Amino acid sequence: MHQKSIEEAKKRLFSGELVIFPTETVYGIGGNANNHKSIELIYKTKNRPINNPLICHFANIREIEKNFVLKDKDYELANTFWPGPLTLILEKNKQSLISPLLSNNKNHVGCRIPNNEISLSLLSILDFPIAAPSANIATRTSATSIKNLDYKLKEIFYIDGGSSVLGLESTVIQTTNNGCKILRLGSLTIEDIKMKFPKYEINIEQSNVSPGNQLKHYSPIKPIRINVDFIKKNETLLNFGVNKLTSNIKNLNLSIKGNLSDASYNFYNYLNILDNTNCSGIAVAPIPDQGLGKTINDRLKRASYKDDK
């Protein structure tokens, strides 16, 4: 069904152009990870700071092994959660062809194998990985469908794969001797990891080798208030579960049943809808701070960040 689009994307990537493609998490805007000019074009197109690294997408673990060193715990996580929303921070080997520009000249790079038929089909016919951040303008909300793309990005060739099935970015992890460090919360939860590896020591940390750690990030254009217990007159409402909160303009509920997987799936789409509503701002109901709720709250905290300087 998408074969012609995949072949066209291949041609464009080989010529140094960018393409927008679906993954199970969010849509990515990608280029040849070995091509310096393609990497520069990604940063320029997104208006993305060069100190915010990119993630490399691969078809299989053999391709990753050609460029990176994997330790025992890297293999444990990879064999359990790939393909899927896991990004592993790995050290480049001496044979690596990966452009240093995508990691701001650091020797560690985020790598993942997406769990999406279209992206895997595309990656399997390339002889290079795809470097791809989320398909948005820097600091803005991620896109989980083509209709969510910023108008500035719709001129770029894209493959329409429908809505992303998970709706939140991948979890960025760096392994340690005793477990792992989570450098960016994502669709793979701490509980998911603990269920498979109960003896792992898991810590949440920040690092400049991981994307997504800017104070202001994942943000709609309209101002946003989180953990609200009342709605202002001209605000829309992003609700969760059953409560008495209501907006006189527009109400969207991430999950009336209080299901965090449903909330994740709807999150960016609903934020985009409310952001395009005639209102003064977006009020967001409290989200349980567990499982995927912890990831949603991380995104909301960054989305609502105000620089008071």
Specify the residue positions occupied by each region the protein language model found.
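Active-site-adjacent structural elements in enzyme catalytic cores
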Residues: 1-309
